[in-house]
């Protein structure tokens, strides 16, 4: 092999190694930042991986919010109509958080099947529903019940005025 071809071969190999390393680093960074969405039914069925950061969403079940009197810890149940999953959160909940509202929680499922959340996101207005939560609720038939309850609540408020 003549020296010019040998030099080109080394350059091509160096470029391939550099691109391979860059792709490997990018994939590793992306893999650590991916938060897959799971419904309460999927979590209850054991489909969500334990110890991996995930997103879970649904409606906060009425009467399920339990606050610790001496800490900021809050336990509540999120449901998609078919199953509910307990979410434990330590911190200040968003102002728009309330029972019957849609939320998305980011955290890890522990060995007891409880989602230990490090972030809770509430709907930013009463008409918005995160797309993943809406699909999960539509699939379980809970979305229609939620809309009927909202319509009845609006009717009650109008008749009270």
Swiss-Prot record:
It is found in: Cell inner membrane. GO terms for cellular component: plasma membrane. The chain crosses the membrane at residues 9-29. Keywords: Cell inner membrane, Cell membrane, Cytochrome c-type biogenesis, Heme, Iron, Membrane, Metal-binding, Signal-anchor, Transmembrane, Transmembrane helix. Its main location: membrane. Residues 1-8 are cytoplasmic. Heme chaperone required for the biogenesis of c-type cytochromes. Transiently binds heme delivered by CcmC and transfers the heme to apo-cytochromes in a process facilitated by CcmF and CcmH. NCBIfam families: PRK13165.1 (NF009638), PRK13254.1-1 (NF009727), PRK13254.1-3 (NF009729), PRK13254.1-5 (NF009731). This is Cytochrome c-type biogenesis protein CcmE. It comes from Ectopseudomonas mendocina (strain ymp) (Pseudomonas mendocina). The gene is ccmE.
């Amino acid at each position: 092999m003549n020296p010019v071809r040998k030099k080109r071969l080394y350059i091509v190999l160096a470029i391939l190694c550099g691109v391979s390393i860059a792709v490997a680093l990018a994939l590793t960074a992306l893999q650590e930042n991916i938060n897959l969405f799971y419904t309460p039914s999927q979590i209850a069925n054991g489909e969500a991986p334990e110890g991996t950061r995930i997103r879970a969403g649904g409606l906060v079940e009425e009467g399920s919010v339990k606050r610790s009197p001496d800490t900021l810890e809050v336990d509540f149940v999120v449901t998609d109509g078919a199953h509910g999953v307990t979410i434990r959160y330590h911190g200040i909940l968003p102002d728009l958080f309330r029972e019957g509202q849609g939320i998305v929680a980011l955290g890890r499922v522990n060995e007891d099947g409880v989602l230990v959340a490090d972030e809770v996101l509430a709907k930013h207005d009463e008409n918005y529903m995160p797309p993943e939560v809406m699909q999960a609720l539509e699939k379980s038939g809970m979305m229609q019940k939620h809309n009927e309850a909202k319509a009845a609540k609006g009717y009650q408020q109008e008749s009270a005025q």
